[in-house]
Amino acid sequence: MSTSTSMRRTPTLSLLTITITSLIFLSLFPRTQSEVITLTSDTFTDKIKEKDTAWFVKFCVPWCKHCKNLGSLWDDLGKAMEGEDEIEVGEVDCGLDKAVCTKVDIHSYPTFKVFYDGEEVARYQGSRDVESMKTFVLGESEKAAAKALESDKEL
């Protein structure tokens, strides 16, 4: 093998080694993808009507100081709820989807509501921390599911 051929292969081999090393390094870190689903005028009604599913939805606007002060709370809640069956965490930007917010009677921000089988079942007004919100939605979801089961038995 000539010296010039060997020199041309060295940069290619180095680049390949760096790429593989980088991919291995990045795979060691957990993904921080949010489990929060953005709901829009096109998706809101169908999503909250999902059978036997509770939706905990945050209604906000980008310019609201109180919404901004939530920081990563909603994303953190979405991650905390990831393993819970039949509970979804969603958000609506009332600046973009005013029709949705008008339909569900949103007049202040942020507003947090729980929907079950398409019906509003609760409004959250408690502490703004992941554990309190998680406890609330788990309890409301359980009550709504029991009520739905009772209604089904009556039919």
Regions from the language model: what does each represent?
Residues 2-155:
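Proteins that catalyze or organize thiol-disulfide redox chemistry
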